[in-house]
Every structure is written in structure tokens, then in C-alpha cells.
Curated annotation (Swiss-Prot):
Taxonomic lineage: Bacteria, Bacillati, Bacillota, Bacilli, Lactobacillales
Keyword Ribosomal protein annotated: no
Species: Streptococcus pyogenes serotype M6 (strain ATCC BAA-946 / MGAS10394)
Name under which the protein is recorded: Glutamate racemase
One GO term (biological process): peptidoglycan biosynthetic process
Active site: C73, C183
Length: 264
């Protein structure tokens, strides 16, 4: 038994979609979450800067005595995950491989779409992972740089959000049967995305898929939390306005949380 928390990092609030699924599947595990909303989005930034910011988040989580770190950010996973994983002596998990694997299982016509930040798409990481596992699957990647600002400003239900999503996704409509939400912010726009793509297109939430792998690693390294603990205390940190973060988090997690401000 290991009651240390699991650390989550993201460029902002998007990683809460992963946390929500973890709380549902593994309610006995404690969480420490850091969202770098002050510097979001990461996607348009240079690779060197993204790596620098990611290491700052990692080092913050290490001060919280975490037993595992989850990159709840596709951009950070694409740029820095392998380096961090090779450096630390605790398990470090990214969201890309779980999402890629789920897409392969989902597609019936071998036509998969991937949407993500400009950096995630430019890295080509999803296509590489998918075609490594299933060479016959065709992958169409599309950068959607306007999605993260919509979520970070809590405008998911606005008319402008619907127009942006419709305009952004039009190149993929009718061409795929599976769509990977290759940014953990994007599930917060899921109803609009599904409406645009149509009911026949299966949406893959890479963050939610990641939770299954978290469970596997907890078992493998024998670092599961206390199954009998009914109430666990989570901690949430943001580099931006805690009130905005709290508002979005409370809606998504369906519970009121306390959010602390941190300067990195």
C-alpha cells in the first residue's frame, strides 16, 4: 500500500478530464494536480519552451512527494515525456499511446482522425504510434489552435465556440469513422464536436483511456493506495486565477474543490 498522491500536469484545465475519470475508476487514490493556465496554450510555443515549462511542472510535483506522474497534456507528452520518463525513478505516463491504441480498436474502416494543438500535430506522434501498431490505418491530423482558449476562458457553451468548432472540423467531416481528441482540453467541447462530426463517428478521449494504464502501472509497481479509504484529499494548483479554474473544475468534476495559486 502506498498512500502518496498521483501527480497530474497540464497546460491548464484540460487535464481535469483525466482526473475526472481517475476519481470515478480509482476513488481511493489521492491526486495532486498542477495546471499552467497562466502560460496556456502550450501548442503554439517553441519546443524548447514547452520542454522548459514541462520540467517546471514536473519539479513542482516532485516537491509534493508523488508516486507517479501523469502527463495529462498531449503537447507536453509529444515534446518532453520520453526525456522525463528516462530521467525519473518513478513511473511517468503520457496520454498518447493509450489514445492511439483505443483508436485502432475503434476504427472499422481504417480511417482515423486526430485533432490536437499545433505542436502535437506537428510532432506527428499520433500517426507514428497508430501506424506502428496498425500500418494499414490511415490517419488524418488536424491542428485546432482555437479550442484551448475557448476552454480556458470557460466559453464552451457559447455560440462562437460552436462556430469555431464547426469551421475547424469541416476538413474531417465525412472522411473518418474515429476521431482522437488529442488534447485533454477537447473533451470539454465533446457535445459540439460530436454534433459536427455526426453520430457515426466514435470520439476517443485520450485522457480517459490513460486511466486504464494508470491502474496497470499501480499494480505492476505495487503502489496502489488504500482501497478501504473512503475519503481522500486532493490538491489542485494553478498558475493563473484560482477562481476561474475552480469554476471550470467544479462543473467538470461535479464537486466543489479548493484551488491554490502557485508561481513557478
Amino acid at each position: 500500500m502506498d498512500t502518496r498522491p498521483i501527480g497530474f500536469l497540464d497546460s491548464g484545465v484540460g487535464g481535469l478530464t483525466v482526473v475526472c475519470e481517475l476519481i470515478r475508476q480509482l476513488p481511493h487514490e489521492k491526486i495532486v494536480y498542477i495546471g499552467d493556465s497562466a502560460r496556456a496554450p502550450y501548442g503554439p510555443r517553441p519546443k524548447k519552451q514547452i520542454k522548459e515549462y514541462t520540467w517546471e511542472l514536473v519539479n513542482f510535483l516532485l516537491t509534493q512527494n508523488v508516486k507517479m506522474i501523469v502527463f495529462a497534456c498531449n503537447t507536453a507528452t509529444a515534446v518532453a515525456w520520453e526525456e522525463v520518463k528516462a530521467t525519473l525513478d518513478i513511473p511517468v505516463l503520457g496520454v498518447v499511446l493509450p489514445g492511439a491504441s483505443a483508436a485502432i480498436k475503434s476504427t472499422t474502416k481504417g480511417q482515423v482522425g486526430v485533432i490536437g494543438t499545433p505542436m502535437t500535430v506537428a510532432s506527428d506522434i499520433y500517426r507514428k504510434k497508430i501506424q506502428l501498431l496498425a500500418p494499414s490505418v490511415q490517419v488524418r491530423s488536424l491542428a485546432c489552435p482555437k479550442f484551448v482558449p475557448i476552454v480556458e476562458s470557460n466559453e464552451m457553451c457559447s455560440s462562437i465556440a460552436k462556430k469555431i468548432v464547426y469551421d475547424s472540423l469541416s476538413p474531417l467531416v465525412g472522411k473518418i469513422d474515429t476521431l482522437v481528441l488529442g488534447c485533454t482540453h477537447y473533451p470539454l467541447l465533446r457535445p459540439i464536436i460530436q454534433n459536427v462530426m455526426g453520430p457515426s463517428v466514435k470520439l476517443i478521449d485520450s485522457g480517459a483511456e490513460c486511466v486504464r494504464d494508470i491502474s496497470v502501472l499501480l499494480n505492476y509497481f505495487d503502489i496502489n493506495g488504500n482501497y478501504h479509504q473512503k475519503a481522500v484529499e486532493h490538491r489542485f494548483f494553478t498558475t493563473a486565477n484560482p477562481e476561474i479554474f475552480q469554476e471550470i473544475a467544479s462543473i467538470w468534476l461535479k464537486q466543489k474543490i479548493n484551488v491554490e495559486h502557485v508561481t513557478l
